[in-house]
Amino acid sequence: MKRIVAIALSLCVLLSMLVMPAVAEESAAYRTLYSGEITSLNYLTTATTNEFALAANVIDTLVEYDKYGQVQPSLAESWEYDAENLTYTFKIREGAKWVKADGTVYADVTANDFVTAAKYLLDAQNASSTANIFYSVIAGAEAYYLGTSTPEEGQEPYPVMDFETVGVKAIDDYTLQYTLVEPCPYFLSMVTYVCFMPVNAEFLAEKGADFGVATSNENILYNGAFVLSTFEPQQKRVYTKNATNWDAENILIETIEQTYNKEAGTLAPEMYARGEIDSADISSTIAAEWLADETKADLIRPVRQSGFYTYFVAFNFDPNFDAEYEPENWKIAVNNVNFRKAFYYGLDRVKSKMVMEPDNPEAILFNTVTPPEFVSINGVDYTEMGALADITALETETFNEEKALEYMNVAVEELKAAGATFPVKMLMPYNPSSSAWAEECVVMEQQLEGLFGTDVIDIIVEAGPSSGFLKEVRRSGKYAFMKCNWGPDYADPNTYTDPFYDGTYNWPELATEYLDENGVS
């Protein structure tokens, strides 16, 4: 098992109480505004929230969740688990259809579609971002995946494996079987994830390299609640009810109309108030103004904005930003333990979260990366089990000015000796399409520079792109210090450890204290 490296500062924030308007009036069309465009329709390779949301609307999975969070049949009518042989056998619903973007039927959905998807996913040349989740639980999948990979220079190639060794089989057209590596009590929750979605083999072969390319809505098939009937990048997306869907009678919205505007976060509230769109996220500042306005007070309601996403501030140990931001100097600074500890105690989490929740910021702060109420056993919440109970019970306010300055004073002397220059430039980008992120960054900048001094640190707040932010900024390493998030891939707390393993997008394994004398992690 890979070594877990804890590098995040302030594993804390669940954005649970942003205000969002209710639907303005009854309509068969649901209209929204958006500023972050998708960059791929390939649900088997993507790993971005925007593209997950699209896939969830247009691709059905074996099971689904009801409004109570309970697993219910979807493309699988029923299933059985054989504990002795570690197999899950799913009975696929007969009559489910694949349709094209214009709604015409292309083929039946069969068990073979899930096998085809697995083979595509496990071909390392297709560069799926979620293949690791699949091969972590399915027998033979990791060995097959490694056998398709290209060895690094000086590395021996892995043995090429036959796909028959992978634990996914179509017993017949409507019987699908998975064999697990080991018992996995949360496996049913995993099959709702993108890496377990099906794909039609004939269509996949027909499209070839164009499968899932985000230039046309005709580059994927649809079997879910909606069809992406119109796709004009950076203009509009229209989802139309899939009349052939097996559960069509329970799809109550006829169309979803999404209009692109790079200023969506700014324009959406007033467009909603004028009745031009049906929902909009609004900041706490706007919420306060509207609640004081009798004509608007009834238009809004609080919502749990981000479900079970948690937010944390991360240091980047492999900076790849422009020279003007002094990445080499940042490397020296971030590799100093006392420098990092200074920020742990120096960041006033309550003050930064007042941008999102001015009345009760403590309500959206916690001490565990796994949020409360995510999973419980015998009525006991996971965050209240064992040693986690002590961590949960700690004060959420970690700010301690005296300790922060003590650590920073030590760090400054150590960094001078190591050749660092001051002030240390800290590039902190944000996604302009995310409500109040810019304001939060400004608060953090002012608070931290006010504490440590602008002669010690220079936090540079910079807007990243609205579309493709994850790829262009976080995955490219173009940040020093940034708010990041993580959402669950399946219903087990283990899913929240992923951002803190080696090989993630803040590269904790490159921290010098984790390297041996040969520079190997």
Predicted segments with their positions:
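Append "and occasionally in soluble cytosolic enzymes with long acidic Gly/Pro-rich linkers
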Residues: 240-241, 333-451
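Sec-dependent signal peptide cleavage junction
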Residues: 17-27
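A bilobed periplasmic-binding-protein/Venus flytrap-type ligand-binding module shared by bacterial periplasmic
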Residues: 240-245, 262, 309-338, 355
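N-terminal lobe/hinge region of extracytoplasmic solute-binding protein
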Residues: 33-83, 221
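Extracytoplasmic/peripheral linker and loop segments enriched in polar/acidic and small residues
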Residues: 152-154, 164, 341, 345, ...
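Ligand-site clamp/hinge motif
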Residues: 193, 211-217, 244-293
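Gly/Pro-rich hinge or "lid" segments in bacterial periplasmic/extracellular proteins
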Residues: 149-165, 169-174, 179-257
